[in-house]
Structures are given as structure tokens and as C-alpha cells.
Amino acid sequence: GFAKDRMAAYGVPTARYGRFTDVAAAKAFLDTLTAPFVLKADGLAAGKGVVIAETREEAEAELADMLSGKFGGASAELVIEEFMEGEEASIFVITDGINYLTLPAAQDHKRIGDGDTGPNTGGMGAYAPAPVMTPELMKRVEEEVTVPMLRGMAGDGMPYRGVLYIGVMVTPDGPKVVEFNCRFGDPECQVLMMQMEADIVPLLLAASTGGMRANEFAQLLPMDANPKPAVTVVVAAPGYPGTPEKGSVIRNLHHAGHGDGVMIFHAGTALDADGNFIANGGRVLNVTATGENLREAVDRAYAAIGEIDWPEGVYRRDIGWRALN
């Protein structure tokens, strides 16, 4: 709700919305919208606090669940939005409150199943750069979102420093903000790190201390140099995004991570008493690769997954499909 109010104040394009703590008022707001309806828990809900309800009945049931504590304190307040039709992308800005550096756009895959089916997750894979975000659209996001938000926050006495995650929907009317996060995305961060040409720590330190200077860090990720495509595929434990089954042994990770351009980031892993890696969370591994083109990066990532001895692992087989098609 705070973010939506700031966007309204600064003229940043986003979906029409309302904020509610009362079921009756929330149901009344549904009368002003047409299905599908977007319902968001106002607080942090591990990436699962957004529900797209296809019918009025589903929306009413879901909003009642949320306001009665489905996500604990995170859904004590509910944001209801009009549905935006389009393709989504993630844009990351690193800023000290005045100066900023925009990273290449990434695109993640929220649904658990191939073809974007099944329930929402924290993200089952990502790739960058995302072709849907053309240079023209990136410029519009900078002018219509990044600059107004940073200037507005600073002008209101609360300059924003750090990583600003801008979730954008590319609609027929242009880019509109779906959400902001005060962090990198997971798994988008993994692909962006693979594209970095130098250590990102000095940039983050400069952002946090207000010491960024224009163009000082441009060599980290030259926007005009077409950074190599990168992809990450999340391998999850069975049961995710519900209750994940923990404890299954994962073998051959060392060998699998030695392919050209491949890096495996651990997420939900642990070591058992014998020193074996085991599944210890929902999203367990991020198998990440770069390539001369996206197809090569995708092939490398899936080849690495094929080397991992973990039959219980669950993953999508179509990461990057929008760009590849």
C-alpha cells in the first residue's frame, strides 16, 4: 500500500487500486472492477502473497482468507488492483538516492509448471536480458518510473538508497509498475551476477553511503555492449510451493557445476552427517549458465541439471521460452 500511494503521488504509471482492512469495503471495491482480480497481501509473504482470482466468487473467498490471517500480519491489510494484461519483466536499479545505474532487464517464471501452469512460486527460473524490454521501453521506465520515484522520495525527505527492483508489466499503453521490492530478485539476481564484468561490492558500498558518481561504475555492466545472455533454472524439492520434502541426498554437484559457463548457486541445501548435500528447503538449487546466445545458455544449464544425481528434484523444462520463441 505504501508503494502504491507513492506511485499515485509521483505520477508513476500503475494499476488502479484500493487498500482494505475490512471485508465489506473490499467486496464493494470489487464492484468497480472486472475479472480477473488481483489481490495482494500488503506485507511480506515469501513471494506468495499475490493471488489472481478469475471469478468474483474466488476473489471474495480469497480476500476473506487473507484478511482473517492467511499470511499472518502480512495480510492484515489487503491491496486490490485491476488486472493488467501484458508481459512482465524485472528491472533493477542501484542508487544512492540521487545517482543510479540500471541493470539489464530480466524475466522470471513464477508458476511451478511448464507453460506457466500451476500455483505461483517465488520463481522457478529467469533469464537476462529480456527482449520484451526494448531500448525504447527501458528509456520510458527510466523517465516515467525511476526518476520520478527517486526524486519524489528524496523530496519527501526519505531518499532511497540500495537496490530498487521494479516489476514492470508491458501493456498496450506502455510500461506500468506491478510492484517494487527493496532487494534483488531471486532468481533474477543469479543471472545478473553472471553478467557482471567486475566486482559489484564497491558499487553497493557506494550506493549505501551516498557515494555513487555518474558513470563511475558503468564498466561493470556496459549497457551498450549487449551482455552475454544468462539463464538460471531452479531445482526445487518435491512438494514445493507447498510443504517441501526435505532430506533427499543430492549427488554429483561438483562435476555438474564444471561445465563451460555454468555455476550452481545453492539455496535450500544442507549437509547430512555423512557430508552429503541434502534438500533442506523449497527452492534448493539455482543452475545458472551463460552463452553466446540464449539458446546456448539454456542448453548448458539443462545439460548441467542432467549431470546432477537427484531424482527427486523438480524443475521446469521451458525456462526462457518467451525469448526463444
Regions found by a protein language model. Give the residues of each.
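Active-site "cap" helix and flanking loop/linker of ATP-utilizing ligase/carboxylase catalytic domains
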Residues: 142-164, 181-261, 272
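Conserved N-proximal alpha/beta basic substrate-recognition cap immediately N-terminal to
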Residues: 1-16, 25-31, 37-38
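Conserved anion/nucleotide-ligand pocket segment
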Residues: 34-56
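Short beta-strand/turn micro-motifs at beta-sheet edges
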Residues: 113-115, 219-221, 270-277
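Internal nucleotide-binding/catalytic subdomain
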Residues: 49-190
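Short, conserved charged micro-motifs
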Residues: 25-26, 58-61, 242-244, 292-299
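Short amphipathic alpha-helical segments
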Residues: 47-49, 231, 281-286
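Generic C-terminus detector
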Residues: 269-274, 278-325
